[in-house]
Amino acid sequence: MVSSQPKYDLIREVGRGSYGVVYEAVIRKTSARVAVKKIRCHAPENVELALREFWALSSIKSQHPNVIHLEECILQKDGMVQKMSHGSNSSLYLQLVETSLKGEIAFDPRSAYYLWFVMDFCDGGDMNEYLLSRKPNRKTNTSFMLQLSSALAFLHKNQIIHRDLKPDNILISQSRMDTSDLEPTLKVADFGLSKVCSASGQNPEEPVSVNKCFLSTACGTDFYMAPEVWEGHYTAKADIFALGIIIWAMLERITFIDTETKKELLGSYVKQGTEIVPVGEALLENPKMELLIPVKKKSMNGRMKQLIKEMLAANPQDRPDAFELELRLVQIAFKDSSWET
């Protein structure tokens, strides 16, 4: 159904990325708060990123508390709006798909095309901002590790490889914190680089394992990229590596300064002289390199240290999959009360 009346009122801008602007918004009928990511489809790259995010989030048939939920996607053209669905025969939707496939605008460039992603509103910023504005806290670290491993297992079960896991892409929801004893809820977001692994050609009914779905496009953020991503031949095990970088950095409060934004970011790295080098890049050059874990603290629980080393193994086959990772983190968190000492 096409309408000239949007269902949402945009309240304020809360974030701006390379291909979209995120607003706090309210649903007119209910006054409920939501987040709206508004993406201008003026370039093929924007369209491709937007469709990747739409396809990934719309492919998920159930919700997970630690994965951002897509309420709906709205396509706006010259003031008219319509709800967009995956596989739609709408000419507007098909023009966007054609633009993504051909790498050139397949519609009248004089028309103003926008996609609105309506999602959960997260009121606590991102994981990077949240952690770096507070003192290290063992309970928070435990909660965040368990939430992130649960989210990743859920995504991989749904054949989704995120490909850009980093603290900036993990949002914080504090609205359900009824008491000061509760930790905030994390939500993995920003699926613009994600990949949905399709069923195998031999048996279309059987979903393909994300750990056997090989990808070749080198993408992500360099300090969180696995060595095989730099090479351009990788699977979902690259997400395990990225999460290993995040967990290691969180436990030891390892940070670096982004050269472009000058922001302090959580992320582990390797020092080579006076330079800091992404762990994945260093392991690509020297796969036998022994990572110094812990690098700042005097000691670390043996099982936690071993798990991080396995997550950051140069050979992806030596890393645990998301389901083993989730189980082992639960065991470490609940069977060893002093795991972080």
Swiss-Prot record:
Gene3D superfamilies: Phosphorylase Kinase, domain 1 (3.30.200.20), Transferase(Phosphotransferase) domain 1 (1.10.510.10). SUPFAM superfamilies: Protein kinase-like (PK-like). It holds the Pfam family Pkinase. It comes from the Eukaryota. SMART domains: S_TKc. Keywords: ATP-binding, Kinase, Nucleotide-binding, Nucleus, Serine/threonine-protein kinase, Transferase. Its EC number is 2.7.11.1. It catalyses: L-seryl-[protein] + ATP = O-phospho-L-seryl-[protein] + ADP + H(+); L-threonyl-[protein] + ATP = O-phospho-L-threonyl-[protein] + ADP + H(+). It is found in: Nucleus. ATP binds at V14, G15, R16, G17, S18, Y19, G20, V21, V22, K37. PANTHER family: EUKARYOTIC TRANSLATION INITIATION FACTOR 2-ALPHA KINASE EIF2-ALPHA KINASE -RELATED, SERINE_THREONINE-PROTEIN KINASE PDIK1L. Belongs to the protein kinase superfamily. Ser/Thr protein kinase family. This is Serine/threonine-protein kinase PDIK1L. It comes from Mus musculus (Mouse). The gene is Pdik1l.
